[in-house]
């Protein structure tokens, strides 16, 4: 059973974990905007509006969450460890993160997911997100929102 027991701000050595996850073809294809990982990490790490968090099941990394805080909306992205996919970890990560004290003040969470990424769409919907519009944007992304 999926169990997330802690979150921690991602540290540079954990990029090795992400490199391993990016060996998965689906991860690489869907998240190619994060490549090269070291350059991506340097950029988000210095932006005060971005936070990257690792989610752990015991000592095992279950997923990574990227959060971009905006004035009205907070954007969220999720990568689940490829070995943990389709086991409820994504939903568990999202639901547990929303109850963390650092994030309970967020009024509106937004996720932009490719229209053909049915697994991610189902994951975010299972965690309480709803479609903002039934049609994708010009880049083929659907926007899902969760209001607190």
Curated annotation (Swiss-Prot):
InterPro entries cross-referenced by the UniProt entry: Acyl_CoA_acyltransferase, GNAT_dom, N-acetyltransferase_domain
EC number(s) per entry: 2.3.1.-
Domain N-acetyltransferase intervals: 8-148
Superkingdom of origin organism: Bacteria
Keyword terms: Acyltransferase, Transferase
Signal peptide, first to last residue: none
Annotated family: Belongs to the acetyltransferase family.
Entry protein name: Uncharacterized N-acetyltransferase YfmK
Gene it is expressed from: yfmK
